[in-house]
Amino acid sequence: QFGLDVKDCGNLSGPANPWQDAVNGFRHLPEVVQWNQLLHEAMYAELQAGRLPIMLGGDHCLGIGSISAVARHCREKGKKLRVLWFDAHADFNTATLTPSGNIHGMPVACLCGHGPKELIEIGGHSADRPALHPKEIRQIGIRSVDEGEKRLVHDMGIEVFDMRFIDEMGMRHAMELALALVDAN
């Protein structure tokens, strides 16, 4: 009807959540790494095949695998990248900033090179050459950020359109600013 060729690639299968306490500041790191590696490979394969992959469901930490695949693809094709991160939270925590060790509060930090090596390096990225640079991300709808996390987001220079901005200026204006300078490349 819309001229789209939709392909359901099914579900990924990975390790179960072991429900354990944090180890060295990270909860379930081996399992999170496995899931993100699986997702990265699946997303990257679809991008290489010329398709636009859409992932439905999952924990916020899976943004590491999906976005690192898009970042890798864009880098290889010489394309610019802009990530719109719609969330109430900045997800820019690190093991030193949060006592919980929950990696679902860390994906943006990991994508920007601040996190465990195993997650930063998915897709061939590194702390020196992260999947994302702060100028490539816009955070939209943020309303609840830990104090240390807030300082780190500010220090990194990430552009944030928090709920106060949206309430005062409107979502349309926030999106116009977030998408400014986006072109066909």
Located regions from the model:
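Conserved alpha-helical scaffold segments that buttress catalytic/binding sites
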Residues: 1-185
